[in-house]
Curated annotation (Swiss-Prot):
Protein name: Chaperone protein DnaJ
Function: Participates actively in the response to hyperosmotic and heat shock by preventing the aggregation of stress-denatured proteins and by disaggregating proteins, also in an autonomous, DnaK-independent fashion. Unfolded proteins bind initially to DnaJ; upon interaction with the DnaJ-bound protein, DnaK hydrolyzes its bound ATP, resulting in the formation of a stable complex. GrpE releases ADP from DnaK; ATP binding to DnaK triggers the release of the substrate protein, thus completing the reaction cycle.
UniProt keyword Chaperone present: yes
Annotated GO CC locations: cytoplasm
Subcellular location(s) of the protein: Cytoplasm
Sorted UniProt keywords: Chaperone, Cytoplasm, DNA replication, Metal-binding, Repeat, Stress response, Zinc, Zinc-finger
Alphabetical list of SUPFAM superfamilies matching this protein: Chaperone J-domain (SSF46565), DnaJ/Hsp40 cysteine-rich domain (SSF57938), HSP40/DnaJ peptide-binding domain (SSF49493)
Zinc finger (CR-type) in chain: 132-210
Binding positions for Zn(2+) 2 per the UniProt entry: C162, C165, C184, C187
Annotated binding of Zn(2+) 1, by residue: C145, C148, C198, C201
CXXCXGXG motif-type repeats, residues: 145-152, 162-169, 184-191, 198-205
InterPro entries: DnaJ, DnaJ_C, DnaJ_domain, DnaJ_domain_CS, HSP40/DnaJ_pept-bd, HSP_DnaJ_Cys-rich_dom, HSP_DnaJ_Cys-rich_dom_sf, J_dom_sf
Required cofactor(s): Zn(2+)
Length: 374
């Protein structure tokens, strides 16, 4: 009986890459796998045909011979009649599908495994984040069971080798002309069985516990930064190493300061008279109060920089600055006399160039409305 073209069997072109070839074989093999088509008597033949095609085309030398001479160039090496045999199909299937079915170089037997990492969110004030601190935290976790030493077996006893898999954690299942490795259903891949479990951990080898830990927070941390505590995660299974604990920083809002990188920002209200005549006032910083000089004729929104009064980055470098934005406060609750004095001041300023921005704005409005055609 004549054989179909191998490229046609896998539905690929003759210039297909090795990666695309493997992908095509996976698709065809999954489609015609006997376990998925128990009601189709032809599926096994189609599966064998696809495996034979892939066995040839995935080998550079065999593929070159096939491209030059066709089936005649590989008949001595491919298929069930040559050196490949059923064992080769098993190897091919395990290589391509090992991560799905546990065959070939895929999963291995169970054994000690690393514990899971944990995450803890630490709320910090801005002061503690900038200056650094040490805090105590309580973390629920899994720790190794002390009575059994993490084995899960009753003290004085030991886990027994699984009789189903012989301690390998895997069993080989014969599927027609090939075999597939699967996780042992008896020991679930552990390779051993606990016949007399520990009463403390009920055979799990680990117990729940809330640990109290001391966390040293370095100066300069910010929201999103993580502090790693090695080995403070969950205990590993079967004596495996513990995972790590990652403490994630969340800096709370401050009543006065806002942080942007290494700089701090704040708003400072000043009186109308200090803005006009100039003055000096105290402003708070994270290191205490400092004096800020306000020059005469200061406009609202102006930024004043206090160098070095910001944040020192956690990874080193120069400290940032404190940026003070002044906000001019309009007087309220004026007395009759105060209002009269302000009226006199207002009258005395008519015709003077005391409000250049306002005058520029009014001039712009005149030009704007003058250009409008009503």
């Amino acid at each position: 009986m004549s054989k179909r073209d191998y490229y046609e069997v896998l539905g690929v072109s003759k210039d297909v890459s090795p990666q695309e070839l493997k992908k095509a074989y996976r698709k065809v093999a999954m489609k015609y796998h006997p376990d998925r088509n128990s009601d189709d008597p032809n599926s096994e033949d189609k599966f064998k045909e696809a495996s034979e095609a892939y066995e040839v085309l995935s080998d550079a030398q065999k593929r070159a011979a096939y491209d030059q001479y066709g089936h005649a160039g590989v008949d001595g090496n491919a298929g069930m009649g040559g050196g490949a045999g059923a064992g080769n199909f098993s190897d091919i299937f395990g290589d391509v599908f090992g991560d799905i079915f546990g065959g070939g170089g895929g999963r291995r037997r169970g054994g000690p495994s690393r514990g899971s990492d944990l995450r803890y969110t630490l709320d910090l004030s801005l002061e503690d984040a900038v200056k650094g601190t040490t805090v105590k935290i309580r973390v629920p976790t899994l720790v190794s069971c002390k009575p059994c030493g993490g084995s899960g077996a009753k003290p004085g006893t030991s886990p027994q080798t699984c009789t189903t898999c012989g301690g390998h954690g895997q069993v080989r299942m014969q599927q027609g002309f090939f075999s597939v490795q699967q996780t042992c259903p008896n020991c679930r891949g552990q390779g051993k069985m606990i016949t007399d479990p520990c009463k403390e951990c009920h055979g799990h080898g680990r117990v729940e516990e809330t640990k109290t830990l001391s966390v040293k927070v370095p100066p300069g941390v910010d929201t999103g930064d993580r502090i790693r505590l090695a080995g403070e995660g969950e205990a590993g299974a079967d004596g495996g190493p513990a995972g790590d604990l990652y403490v994630q920083v969340d800096v709370q809002d401050h009543a006065f300061f806002q942080r942007e990188g290494r700089n701090l920002y704040c708003e400072v209200p000043i009186s109308l008279f200090d803005a006009c005549l100039g003055g000096e006032l105290e402003v708070p910083t994270l290191d205490g109060r400092v004096k800020l000089k306000i020059p005469a004729e200061t406009q609202t929104g102006k930024l004043f920089r206090l160098r070095g009064k910001g944040v020192t980055p956690v990874r080193g470098g120069a400290a940032g600055d404190l940026m003070c934005r002044v906000i001019i406060e309009t007087p309220v609750n004026l007395t009759k006399k105060q209002k009269e004095l302000l009226e006199e001041l207002k009258a005395s300023m008519k015709g003077e160039k005391n409000s250049p921005k306002q005058e520029s704005w009014f001039e712009g409005m005149k030009n704007f409305f003058g250009d409008l055609k009503m």
